[in-house]
Amino acid sequence: MLAVLKGIPLIQDIRAEGNSRSWIMTIDGHPARGEIFSEAFSISLFLNDLESLPKPCLAYVTLLLAAHPDVHDYAIQLTADGGWLNGYYTTSSSSELIAIEIEKHLALTCILKNVIRNHHKLYSGGV
């Protein structure tokens, strides 16, 4: 799977992390990480630090994901680093399909980053 991901132009600086199941990378300049499972793998793109992702904003973003019928393969993951948008992929997909899905994942990440930034400005008195 690592070889397939290395062949996708949007993915840069990919390397194994600790064990062969996890990787860190950048996707079009955005921090990302991945993990492989038995027949699937996930890629997480960094959204924002937790300070800029308060509970009301997190609830709003989560509802946006839940309400849209075409984003059922995505989830928000919270870590000590911040919030990540997780996308799930099957290992049996072609490299072309994986590349297309990663482009969609990146686009959704950029949209959500913008929503978070605007939400933060609105509720922190920046607008």
UniProtKB/Swiss-Prot annotation:
It comes from the Bacteria. Keywords: Virulence. Putative virulence protein. This is SpiC homolog. The gene is spiC.
